[in-house]
Amino acid sequence: MKMKAMLSQPTNGKTEEEIATTRERAIATLESMGYEVVNTLLTDEWYSPDSCEARGVVNRPMMFLAKSLENMSLCHVAYFCKGWKNARGCRIEHAVAEAYGLTILYEEGDE
């Protein structure tokens, strides 16, 4: 069985290009280490503001965090991208990863 990893990546205030570049670099790093990366970037229509509102979601950031934690349950490793300490969701993901014994990796220079 291939070990699975997830990314914890700050996105607030970043352009789509910045997010994609960081994400691609992190995925390449994890794949070169032999991990299968579980997608935690939720971009399809189901997660759009209108769709969430229609379903009664009143706190989208919390919904994204909940889905991320669900995906984390599939993983052995959590990889934290630079700037994670400044992002509320990433800090929560880090605390959960520590509490539940996931292996924690950091983007170079950001422990």
Describe the residue ranges of each PLM region.
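Conserved catalytic or regulatory cores that recognize and/or transform ribose-phosphate-containing ligands
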Residues: 1-111
